[in-house]
Every structure is written in structure tokens, then in C-alpha cells.
Amino acid sequence: MATYAIVKTGGKQYKVAVGDVVKVEKLESEPGAKVSLPVALVVDGAAVTSDADALAKVAVTGEVLEHVKGPKIRIHKFKNKTGYHKRQGHRQQLTVLKVTGIK
């Protein structure tokens, strides 16, 4: 089994391994910058580590590749019989990360 980790960022959790490219909520880092992500769980073969003291020694590092926008979602509000309707769109800001190491 390969080594992988569960990292927390932007209020979500992602399963990552070395070499993975993932889209996460926007980070305030420039493209090319190195970032470290907080770890929730590490699986190394058959050994599963979830103890907070052991995870404090583990670091998942990555490199910011670019900042992109997610797909457009459309919001539509409507109230019956009053003629009220409102349309709105939203595109979430995302950061593309390449995981460079789990140590």
C-alpha cells in the first residue's frame, strides 16, 4: 500500500499522496510558493496514525501551481404571486496544489 494522508484546509478534508494535484479553497500564496498543510490522518502501508502528538511531527508539503475559478453555480430566488425573482451566479476561487512530500 502507498503512503497517503488526509489534510485539512478551507474547512474541507482531502486525501493526498505524493505527486497528487488537488484543487483546494483559495490560499493566500503566490504561484510557485511552498505551503504546509495540517494533517488529520496518515496511512503508511498498514500503519494508521491519527494520534495528535504523532501528527504534530508529520508535515505535508506542497507547491502552489496556480489560482483558478471553479465552475459557475446559479442561484435563483423566486416569490410566488409578487413578480419577485432574482438571479445570481458565483464562481469559487480555488488554488491548484501539487503535493511534494509527506514526512
From Swiss-Prot:
Signal peptide boundaries: none
An MF annotation (GO) of this entry: structural constituent of ribosome
BP terms from Gene Ontology: translation
Membership in a protein family: Belongs to the bacterial ribosomal protein bL21 family.
Primary role: This protein binds to 23S rRNA in the presence of protein L20.
Protein's UniProt name: Large ribosomal subunit protein bL21
Any one annotated GO CC term: ribonucleoprotein complex
UniProt subunit comment: Part of the 50S ribosomal subunit. Contacts protein L20.
Swiss-Prot/TrEMBL keywords: Ribonucleoprotein, Ribosomal protein, RNA-binding, rRNA-binding
PROSITE patterns (UniProt xref): RIBOSOMAL_L21
